[in-house]
């Protein structure tokens, strides 16, 4: 089972803005993809989502470090996403820990990502980021 997860992670990590046509090798036509900020249904919407994602960043990389099968055709991938956006954190590299829950037969038909949306985006916005940092200091 973890062979599927390792192979999926390897292929996913090789994706970039010029290879999104390969999403069809990883996902079914009716894939359901969800993360804390988006929900898309179908390979066409998924391709559009990733096209927009890659268009808005200058660098994007996934480093997978955990491959955890939980049953037949299901499991978790643990990863660190690293990206640069010209308008966030002065274009500095931002790293976000996360995990993906996958359901598959021959290909993935359900993909659910879990990550801290604040660490991904909100904490790096000029005004909102300062407010979040202040709140974290007060609560910590």
Cite the ranges covered by each PLM segment.
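A short alpha-helix capping/helix-coil boundary motif
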Residues: 1, 29, 77-78
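Basic/polar N-terminal segments that are highly enriched at the extreme N-terminus
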Residues: 1-3, 139-140
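Short acidic-aromatic low-complexity motifs
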Residues: 2-26
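Soluble or luminal CAZymes and related metallo-dependent hydrolases
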Residues: 3-7, 45, 94
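A solvent-exposed, acidic/Ser-Thr-rich amphipathic alpha-helical stretch
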Residues: 20-24, 28-73
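A beta-strand edge to alpha-helix "cap/lid" segment located at domain peripheries
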Residues: 55-61, 69-140
């Amino acid at each position: 089972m973890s062979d599927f997860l390792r192979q999926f992670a390897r292929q996913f990590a090789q994706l970039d803005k010029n290879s999104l046509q390969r999403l069809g090798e990883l996902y079914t036509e009716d894939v359901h993809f969800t993360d804390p900020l988006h929900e898309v249904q179908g390979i066409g919407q998924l391709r559009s989502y990733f096209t927009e994602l890659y268009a808005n960043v200058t660098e994007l990389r996934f480093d997978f470090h955990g491959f955890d099968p939980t049953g037949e055709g299901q499991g978790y991938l643990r990863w660190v996403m690293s990206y640069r956006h010209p308008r966030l954190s002065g274009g500095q590299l931002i790293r976000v820990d996360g995990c993906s829950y996958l359901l598959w037969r021959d290909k993935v038909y359900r993909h659910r990502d879990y990550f801290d949306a604040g660490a991904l985006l909100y904490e790096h916005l000029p005004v909102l980021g300062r407010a979040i940092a202040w709140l974290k200091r007060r609560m910590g």
